[in-house]
């Protein structure tokens, strides 16, 4: 009985000493240093590996890092990414750096770094002029020079659509801004 009382008192003492430090760390650690995000390019790993070792394991999708330019908060429930391939097939990520056509912006559950299958995804695509619903038909050119990809923000210019697209992720949602550079009919395909 005495041992239990000492253990309880010791536990309470530790909790009293450690908890204030934990709460102050949370308030400091909750802020994000925006300048550090500029050093992160989430497109790294979306092109084939150039190393000799990668070739030892295969010459198909295994040579990719299977990453994607996702925007999300840490430990978020979902994330959004640019989509260059309309598939939920095993070992094929929604985005690859070598692709030159963008099909939309995808809410994905892709396991980054793995070779599993995506599931339950949904894609949004802003269009200008003519409504095109099929992924291949709505594909539009984009350039990596007019693309920015960080964990907090993704932007790309879609010159054929006259659209400047921006997105940022939250833990369970995303915020989009589509800026049309010309007057006319604009669409958002879901």
Where are these regions (language model features)?
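Bacterial Sec-dependent signal peptides at the C-terminal "C-region" and cleavage site
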Residues: 18-32
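Accessory carbohydrate-recognition regions in carbohydrate-active enzymes
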Residues: 29-190
């Amino acid at each position: 009985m005495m041992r239990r009382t000492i253990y309880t008192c010791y536990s309470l003492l530790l909790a009293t000493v450690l908890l204030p430090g934990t709460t102050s760390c949370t308030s400091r650690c909750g802020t994000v240093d925006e300048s550090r995000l500029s050093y992160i390019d989430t497109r790294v790993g979306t092109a084939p590996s150039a190393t000799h070792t990668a070739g030892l394991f295969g010459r198909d999708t295994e040579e990719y890092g299977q990453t994607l330019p996702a925007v999300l908060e840490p430990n978020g429930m979902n994330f959004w990414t640019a989509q260059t391939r309309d598939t939920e097939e095993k070992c094929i990520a929604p985005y690859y750096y070598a692709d030159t056509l963008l099909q939309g912006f995808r809410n994905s559950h892709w396991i980054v770094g793995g070779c599993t299958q995506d599931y339950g995804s949904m894609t949004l695509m802003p269009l200008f002029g003519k409504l095109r619903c099929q992924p291949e038909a709505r594909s539009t050119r984009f350039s990596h020079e007019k693309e920015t990809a960080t964990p907090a923000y993704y932007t790309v210019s879609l010159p054929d659509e006259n659209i400047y697209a921006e997105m940022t992720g939250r833990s369970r949602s995303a915020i989009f801004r589509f800026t049309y550079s010309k007057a006319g009919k604009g669409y958002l395909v879901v």
